[in-house]
Amino acid sequence: MTTKRKAYVRPMTSTWWKKLPFYRFYMLREGTAVPAVWFSIELIFGLFALKHGAESWMGFVGFLQNPVVVILNLIALAAALLHTKTWFELAPKAANIIVKDEKMGPEPIIKGLWVVTAVVTVVILYVALYW
C-alpha cells in the first residue's frame, strides 16, 4: 500500500554539529586524522631520502627546518596528543577489570597508559640520541 502523503523531512543545516560542544569536540577529534596524514607522508619522504643517500637526507633535514614545516609538525604533535588522550579515556570502557569483586575505575588504567607512553618515549629518545 502506498500513500500520497509527503513524508516529513526534518531540516538539517550543514552546521548542525556546531550547536553542541560534544559534537564540536567530536569533529575536532576526527579532524586529527588530517595532521596524521601530513606526518605519515612526511615520514615516508624521510625514509626515501634516507634510502637515496646522505645528500638527499641533508635536503630532507633542511626541509624539516623550514618554519612552516616546524609549525605543521607542532600541530601534528598536538593532534596526536589529543587523539591519544581520547583513546586512553576510551580504553577503560572497553575492558572490564575486576579486582576483589569490584570493577576497577578508569583512573589507574588511564594513568598506566600514560606511564607506558612516557617510558616508551624516553627509551626511543635515548636510543635515538645516545645509542
Swiss-Prot record:
Query: Where is this chain's protein located in or outside the cell?
Result: Cell inner membrane
* Record gene name: frdC
Name of the protein described by the UniProt record: Fumarate reductase subunit C
The answer, when asked if Transmembrane is one of the entry's keywords, is yes
Summary of subunit composition and partner proteins? Part of an enzyme complex containing four subunits: a flavoprotein (FrdA), an iron-sulfur protein (FrdB), and two hydrophobic anchor proteins (FrdC and FrdD).
Relate the protein's function as given in its record: Two distinct, membrane-bound, FAD-containing enzymes are responsible for the catalysis of fumarate and succinate interconversion; fumarate reductase is used in anaerobic growth, and succinate dehydrogenase is used in aerobic growth. Anchors the catalytic components of the fumarate reductase complex to the cell inner membrane, binds quinones.
Q: Which GO terms describe its cellular component?
A: fumarate reductase complex; plasma membrane
Recorded topology in the membrane = Multi-pass membrane protein
Family that this chain belongs to: Belongs to the FrdC family.
Q: Which residues cross the membrane?
A: 30-50, 57-77, 109-129
InterPro entries registered for this protein in UniProt? Fumarate_red_C, SQR/QFR_C/D
Molecular-function GO terms, alphabetical: succinate dehydrogenase activity
What Pfam families does the annotation carry?
A: Fumarate_red_C (PF02300)
List the source organism. Answer: Citrobacter koseri (strain ATCC BAA-895 / CDC 4225-83 / SGSC4696)
Alphabetized NCBIfam families for the sequence:
PRK04987.1
Q: Which UniProt keywords apply?
A: Cell inner membrane, Cell membrane, Membrane, Transmembrane, Transmembrane helix
Q: Taxonomically, which superkingdom?
A: Bacteria
